[in-house]
């Protein structure tokens, strides 16, 4: 599972500033996710290839009434669902009673906690943080989040070693009891994602790996009904009330000779409507299920249309690089006029998702469900397809011939060669001169050209650009013996002319 890091502290100590610093390292989705109270934000971040989910919480006001009664509920939940806590204090304001109360609560929870003193810019850090040693939380890590000072050290010297040593151990569902099976599955996944050696890849076929399919969406859109329809049994509790599913449920299954692991998730609800503690915990599990899946099936209610919550969830899926199938449920019973209106709205709001298949189904009655797995397998096969360097380079040159790269600083951008940089999602790495200066419009053109040429559907494509290093940069040009003789003759000639 992806580790979860919570930022906790009093109001205005710089939690959101640090949150933006952390999530910006990977252009993560930084937004107030639906299903969460106003003071909690979730984002994705990365340290040297190690991904984690970061939670920004609202300020905690631990006054004379006690931290247990005054601590904001969303901050309490963030502490509980986190694997590690970054407790932030204000070095300029000094130690406050609320800091002491929060530290006491954190010690009682026995969570791994690192004390971070923010706003140390312009101060003698050692003197400014001396009072915070009384909190009894160990070493203090001074930073200036607004300027980025100390943030890299915090990541590399604190969080990264912790992530390397402590793998979050979470409760497994009944279907995950066979540890050997899951260990073997993880080893195979490493090969799918391009982490295997060349010898291992030669005898590995992605078709041997079960496809992990996550079914996600807002509450009461019919996710569990769809799961039961696919399985042909009442495997998941279904009741006409939002929030029936409380956790992500992993269900192995087989269809048409191919193995799948179905992940039925809890719904991501509109903020302000999440009241029960257990339901709030399920949101983070949904996000982790998306990270863990190969293909994500986003279920939308045809009666309600696509909402802002659907778009926010869609944004997280795209940032995760997961393959996508869009399912519009409860299609039965709608008049043709209403169906046309729904399709028109989908075209308008999902115009930027041109690679995902859209299915209109009725999970309750089963209409259209049988066609879903064609799109699921298509998306997975496209995301794990191996393409050699020669083919990618040929496609790149064809794209450049059809539409030349633009001029950058009066020089034509030169595309040299392309190769695969990873799978699931497919990554194409293009090498050349000034390629990083290409405008976004031409980058989109290349991405769409690769998609059409490789006939890729159901999965996003990522293109990375690399420029070759100049081998002579910073080096003095050494003259050949012949050039040295010519230089001596020229210097002698110039001296004679001066006389």
Swiss-Prot record:
Keywords: GTP-binding, Nucleotide-binding, Repeat, Ribosome biogenesis. GTP 2 binds at residues 217-224, 264-268, 329-332. GTP 1 binds at residues 9-16, 56-60, 118-121. PROSITE patterns: G_ENGA. InterPro entries: G_ENGA, GTP-bd, GTPase_Der, KH_dom-like, KH_dom-like_a/b, P-loop_NTPase, Small_GTP-bd. GO terms for molecular function: GTP binding; ribosome binding. Residues 3-166, 211-384 form the EngA-type G domain. Residues 385-469 form the KH-like domain. The keyword Repeat applies. GO terms for biological process: ribosome biogenesis. Pfam families: KH_dom-like, MMR_HSR1. It comes from the Bacteria. GTPase that plays an essential role in the late steps of ribosome biogenesis. PANTHER family: GTPASE DER. Belongs to the TRAFAC class TrmE-Era-EngA-EngB-Septin-like GTPase superfamily. EngA (Der) GTPase family. NCBIfam families: GTPase_EngA (TIGR03594), small_GTP (TIGR00231). Associates with the 50S ribosomal subunit. This is GTPase Der. It comes from Erwinia tasmaniensis (strain DSM 17950 / CFBP 7177 / CIP 109463 / NCPPB 4357 / Et1/99).
């Amino acid at each position: 599972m992806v580790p979860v890091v919570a930022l906790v502290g009093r109001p205005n100590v710089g939690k959101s500033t640090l949150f933006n610093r952390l999530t910006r390292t990977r252009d993560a989705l930084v937004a107030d996710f639906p299903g969460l109270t106003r003071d909690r934000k979730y984002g994705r971040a990365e340290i040297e290839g190690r991904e984690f989910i970061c939670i920004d919480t609202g300020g905690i006001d631990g006054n004379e009434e006690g931290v247990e009664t005054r601590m904001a509920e969303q901050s309490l939940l963030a502490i509980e669902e986190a694997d590690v806590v970054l407790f932030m204090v204000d070095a300029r304001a000094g130690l406050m009673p609320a800091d002491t109360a929060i530290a006491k609560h954190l010690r009682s929870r026995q969570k791994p906690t690192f004390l971070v003193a923010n706003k140390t810019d312009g101060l003698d850090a050692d003197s400014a943080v001396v009072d915070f040693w009384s909190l009894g939380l160990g070493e203090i890590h001074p930073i200036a989040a607004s300027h980025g000072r100390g943030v890299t050290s915090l990541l590399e010297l604190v969080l990264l070693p912790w992530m390397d040593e402590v793998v979050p151990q979470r409760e497994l569902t009944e279907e995950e009891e066979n540890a050997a099976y899951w260990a073997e599955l993880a080893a195979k996944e490493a090969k799918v994602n391009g982490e295997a050696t060349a010898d291992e890849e030669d005898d590995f076929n992605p078709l041997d790996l079960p496809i992990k399919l996550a079914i996600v969406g807002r509450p009461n859109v019919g996710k569990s009904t769809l799961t039961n329809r696919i399985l042909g049994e009442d495997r998941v509790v279904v009741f006409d009330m939002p929030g029936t599913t409380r956790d992500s449920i992993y269900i192995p299954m087989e269809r048409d000779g191919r193995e799948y692991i179905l992940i039925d998730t809890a719904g991501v609800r509109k903020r302000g409507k999440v009241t029960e503690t257990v339901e709030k915990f399920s949101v983070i599990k949904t996000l982790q299920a998306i990270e863990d899946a190969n293909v994500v099936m986003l279920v939308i209610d045809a009666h309600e249309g696509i909402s802002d919550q659907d778009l926010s969830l869609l944004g997280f899926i795209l940032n995760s690089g997961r393959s996508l199938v869009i399912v519009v449920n409860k299609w039965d019973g709608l008049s043709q006029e209403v169906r046309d209106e729904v399709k028109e709205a989908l075209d308008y709001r999902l115009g930027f998702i041109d690679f995902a298949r859209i299915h209109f189904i009725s999970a309750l009655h089963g209409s259209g469900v049988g066609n879903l797995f064609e799109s699921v397998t298509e998306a997975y096969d496209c995301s794990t397809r191996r393409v050699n360097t020669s083919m990618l380079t040929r496609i790149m040159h064809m794209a450049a011939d059809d539409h030349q790269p633009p001029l950058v600083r009066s020089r034509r951008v030169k595309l040299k060669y392309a190769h695969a940089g990873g799978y699931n999602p497919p990554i194409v790495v293009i090498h050349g001169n000034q390629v990083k200066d290409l405008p976004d419009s031409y980058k989109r053109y290349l991405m769409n050209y690769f998609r059409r040429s490789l006939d890729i559907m159901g999965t996003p494509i990522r293109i990375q650009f690399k420029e070759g290093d100049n081998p002579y940069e910073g080096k003095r040009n050494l003259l050949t013996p012949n050039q040295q003789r010519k230089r001596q003759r020229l210097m002698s000639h110039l001296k004679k002319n001066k006389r």
